[in-house]
UniProtKB/Swiss-Prot annotation:
Residues at which Ca(2+) 2 binds: Q229, K230
Residues that hold Ca(2+) 4 according to the record: E292, D299, E323
Region (Domain IV): 530-700
Main location: cytoplasm
Protein name per Swiss-Prot or TrEMBL: Calpain-2 catalytic subunit
Gene expressing this chain: CAPN2
Source organism of this protein record: Bos taurus
Amino acid sequence: MAGIAAKLAKDREAAEGLGSHERAVKYLNQDYAALRDECLEAGALFQDPSFPALPSSLGFKELGPYSSKTRGIEWKRPTEICDNPQFITGGATRTDICQGALGDCWLLAAIASLTLNEEILARVVPLDQSFQENYAGIFHFQFWQYGEWVEVVVDDRLPTKDGELLFVHSAEGSEFWSALLEKAYAKINGCYEALSGGATTEGFEDFTGGIAEWYELRKAPPNLFRIIQKALQKGSLLGCSIDITSAADSEAITFQKLVKGHAYSVTGAEEVESRGSLQKLIRIRNPWGEVEWTGQWNDNCPNWNTVDPEVRETLTRQHEDGEFWMSFNDFLRHYSRLEICNLTPDTLTSDSYKKWKLTKMDGNWRRGSTAGGCRNYPNTFWMNPQYLIKLEEEDEDQEDGESGCTFLVGLIQKHRRRQRKMGEDMHTIGFGIYEVPEELTGQTNIHLSKKFFLTTRARERSDTFINLREVLNRFKLPPGEYIVVPSTFEPNKDGDFCIRVFSEKKADYQVVDDEIEANIDEIDISEDDIDDGFRRLFAQLAGEDAEISAFELQTILRRVLAKRQDIKSDGFSIETCKIMVDMLDSDGSGKLGLKEFYILWTKIQKYQKIYREIDVDRSGTMNSYEMRKALEEAGFKMPCQLHQVIVARFADDDLIIDFDNFVRCLIRLETLFRIFKQLDPENTGMIQLDLISWLSFSVL
């Protein structure tokens, strides 16, 4: 219940703009300005109680409290490390980012790329911070986290060993923005050790809010040059690098003056006519301008003399230091990897860019209800969340003569780094894309069934299921309606996720799910219509007062179920029996008369029949995945969110729902639907309750 209330509150806040860059969510409700002012007024330096200068903030295993790697560590403020500490001096440069004793080179590569764009850097690292003016030992940074911007506050106590920073540091040792940025990122992920191992694209996304894709250039798709051109037109950040094979290879310079393991940026892609044929050229920037390419199409290459002078002048006059052209074929031959971070429309302030259209959907997998696993598990795969995407407009320019709608799909699992301290790690995740059959187009209130997936192949799917934070692929499909089904590889893995779709043209989306529906059988009977046999049975069971209490009902039903071999049951709990009596006790006596007992008896017989039919393995019990079908047979259709609540409430640790809990669930549902209908005679779908009414119904 608390989780549902929190989600509703969060959705309302998001609708009001909370989570945008301008109104970032305050992580752990820490307000930077208020905390800084408190410290300044008190004349004290900030000490962060939520990320203390203790071993728990370092790690849990390799950097755990008893690890040899953490012995002798002291937490010091920059003012204790050097004489004249600076937050940032002369802009952000590569020399500000030197790796320490932590395997987070993926993060540092992303930070290095961040330094190439001052506007985006300023969003993540507010530059109006210093160790002089209004210094209170507190700093703040902003990160994108699964669809919202989050402001993270840290104190400036940093882990040191032998007087030197243990982790990220500047080459000069006096600039601290990168070390404090790393600390803030460690805080939001639980500890420093949680940052060990990752993909640069993860850092790209958390610093920009974009969606990052990468290409192994030895397996480059045939249209990669056009992909690069379009990405540049959309203001995307593009980086490339040459793989290293050993630590000694790092920063090694090739004979044509390219640096291995070095982060380059791609800044241009043009086709020029040379010697009667078109040449594809790529412009690359070495952000630190130390060495430049000496191969074909370098600044002094005679190839430029074969190009129209006006074109040559246009392409070469805007050169920055460290920027050079090379042929696309040489690019594919010499570089190993290309990363493209496609930025969201709100990140791009210039109107000159052709902006992507962004769609984001949140969801979760819950053990026993919506965590169905991949297609290898056909009995449960259909239980996964399902999302509809409508592609309506084809791309403006159709490359390679292929028409269709280009879009990227990224599936991100949330908060998994933070859970490493609890022994958890990344799930293996992926997704499939299915074309909606013609007879179902235009409908959004149907959760596609097991039969559909048994008889329908995926139109597209993620390249692989992988245990990274995100799996992402680029697709091109004809206009139409498609269902995206995200899943973990194995079923019953709890997790939260978000799906983002970047499309060249606007794409509509929505969750595909069953609408709430209740078709409750009305048993309309008078006492005169009840047969004599049932009357005699009731007289024997009810005793002298001719009524049956909840306690008497429990005894009766235990005897009945004890005779059945096809349903495993220890009888009904007194709670279930009280719920049954409450639903049918029209006169408020707390007991059931003849007619009321007849109606209950009829319902229980119906529930027994459903329970037996759904129990296909004849185990005498029902697993939680069978519950959805059982509820439909009983007349109830509900969305995934309610199925998650039902499984959490009525299934045991082994995801078994026994007959007692099955009946209790159905009785409670029927009671709640009847109450709602009584209070909403006009079928508006809304009711108003005062506090006492809400509490009265809630304790049912």
